[in-house]
A protein has these predicted regions:
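Aromatic-lined carbohydrate-binding/catalytic grooves of carbohydrate-active enzymes
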Residues: 2-5, 22-66, 76, 84-91
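Acidic, glycine-anchored loop motifs typical of Ca2+
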Residues: 5, 9, 101
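Alpha-helical packing segments of well-folded alpha/beta enzyme cores
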Residues: 16-19, 63, 67, 169-176
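Conserved oxyanion/phosphate-binding beta-strand-loop segments in alpha/beta enzyme cores
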Residues: 21-38, 121-137
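Conserved Rossmann-like nucleotide-binding pocket used by diverse enzymes
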Residues: 32, 79, 142, 146
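Transmembrane beta-barrel strand/turn architecture of Gram-negative outer membrane proteins
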Residues: 71-80
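Alpha-amylase-like alpha-glycosidases and glucanotransferases acting on alpha-linked glucans and related
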Residues: 88-176
Length: 176
């Protein structure tokens, strides 16, 4: 059952903290949480808009840090469901990647070199940005795919994992 401590109808970090002793008493030694980062929640938080900000519906970054502290105090573990394959279209990286002028985020996502043509076995969006090309999406149209590169390139627009865009994506996700 959800523990809602602020009356908005959604379980939150403080609610989990209040139930930790009960969870421990059940014999659990770990808690696995759904994505709890800032998100427009078009897919239950799996469309992350900011990996460095807790979703306000669950609490603050300070509340999340306190949750970690309280969990560890009880010799338990906490696992956060990290979504490294895509972000939300609301993510600042994606907004920058959509710009026509090259910038540090241009190759952070997987873009084709043309808005025309059908991609085999890949969902994509076209006509949503200033730049030429379509962006590959994961699962839903509001989840643009992050670019980690392609080991077996079959298209000219696919980048190697060692190219600057994929390397920057990997380096940033390692910081998350």
């Amino acid at each position: 059952r959800d523990r809602d401590t602020n009356g908005d109808g959604i379980g939150d970090f403080q609610g989990i903290i209040e139930r930790l002793d009960y969870i421990k008493k059940l014999g659990c030694n770990a808690i696995w949480m759904n994505p709890c980062f800032a998100s427009p929640f078009g897919d239950a938080g799996y469309d992350v808009a900011d990996y460095y900000q807790a979703a306000p519906r669950y609490g603050t970054n300070a509340d999340l840090k306190r949750l970690f502290h309280e969990v560890h105090k009880r010799d338990m573990h906490i696992l956060l469901d990290l979504v490294p394959g895509h972000t939300s279209v609301a993510h600042p990286w994606f907004k920058e990647s959509c710009k026509a002028d090259r910038n540090e985020f241009t190759d952070r996502y997987i873009w084709t070199d043309s808005t025309w043509g059908q991609l085999e076995n890949m969902g994509s969006l076209c006509g949503i940005s200033e730049r030429e090309g379509s962006v590959i999406v994961n699962f839903f149209a509001h989840q643009p795919a992050l670019n980690y590169g392609f080991y077996k390139k079959t298209q000219g627009w696919q980048q190697d994992p060692d190219d600057p865009g994929p390397k920057a994506t990997l380096a940033e996700m390692e910081n998350v």
